[in-house]
Amino acid sequence: MSFGRSPGLTDVIANSKEADSMSETTDSRTRWLALYVLCLASLMIVLDVTIVGVALPSIREDLGFSETSLAWVVNGYLLTYGGFLLLGGRLGDLFGHRRLFILGISAFTVASLACGLATTQWSLVAARAVQGLGGAVASAVSLSLMMGLFTEPADRAKAMGIFGFVASGGGSIGVLLGGILTDTLNWHWIFLVNFPIGVLVVLLTLRLVPVVPAAAAGGRLDLSGAITVTASLMLAVYAIVNGNEKGWTSVQTLAVLAASAAVFAAFLTIESRVRVPLVPLRLFRLRNLSTASGIGVLWAAAMFAWFFMTALYLQLVLDYTPLQIGLAFLPGNVIMGILSIGLSAKLVMRYGIKKPLTTGLLLASAGLALLVRAPIDGSFVVDVLPSMILLGLGAGMAFNPVLLAAMGDVEPAESGLASGVVNTSFMMGGAVGLAVLASVAASRTNTLVDTGHGQIAALAGGYHLAFLIGAIFAAGAAVIGATLLRESAPAPEEAHGAPAAECA
């Protein structure tokens, strides 16, 4: 396979006409305020995946969900979110990233209100599906908006670090916030809290984010490609989220996966023949975008091992309350924030993207590996905190360079699509990773119970295996980054001169 040229950070900036246009009409203070608005929107969407998990028992009791139907409170969101990321990104390229961002956040906000006011099962699940759709559209174009706001290498690296912290740390913040809202108020407020925030985001976006003509304006929407890729992704997500319940070798699961593969094959055929494809296949010849997407799949799987498996270990083995679980994640989040916001940009400007990315992933792998030895009577300070510190360090270092790598090769006319691709890789990696880890942990637990181990010890043994696999995922991502990623280093004078110093 021949790969497209991967420009350096300065080349990316020079070639970004859309970014230059946006930058010329936006002063520095307004650009940073606009970034915080984009981050607030991203945080709201990321939170919604994990914040619901804490409230599921309360939702089940209040609305009368069965164990099977309760899963659709989560799956309804994931189905539309995963299905519409690529289409949302391409629509942003065609009709304007700012316009699609506002539409996506508006849909998400109204759907959040509907979720909070829901009094029946079907109304909650339907509103969750609309939430996922709005979240997908907004997420797919947010990276493009951010890349357009910042043109200087140092500023862009710093902005990407802040954005990466929100994307990586939002999940564990959701656990804390979900615990607080559920314990002090009720489950309705985990959704209602989004409404005023969403309205504020829309108003501030109209005020702070400049209007830039769509880079691919005038292009036609590949309707057949849009239908097939969205259907393929939704079928894949459906099979994954139901795999553990229905069985991975069941007729239903295999049939849905086969249907997803067949529809995706049809999508590839369509894209190779139409004049203006939804996803130009040459995009996947861009080395850093393809590599970053592969890293994203493994890294998201490892992060889900951290968020969900650690939360289950703390709750079911160490008997933590939801609020205590949220507080347990705080040290990792604080460290992640310090690195992402203050130091990650300096590391990228000085060393490029490969070294910080590889080092961060290896630190995260070590953090997950430490959890493999967490005992059933573990102490937070001795058995959990060291892992949280390593994972915070690793995530804080890794997210900035992986996002820069993913977006660095892409022309402005396809930046929304590239953002959709990398977001899809993270989403699918998280979904597949969680399904695999949950299945492996459950199987290991059952085996240990059958051989005479106590229930708590068996649960811990299942989580230990999940942590080990998560560590392997993170280490595998580090190897891919070290061997396949093309370095996009700033020029020497930028790496060591004034621009780098301005990152702080």
Features from the language model and the residues they span:
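Interfacial helix-cap and linker-helix signal at transmembrane-aqueous boundaries
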Residues: 59-60, 91-92, 177-185, 240, ...
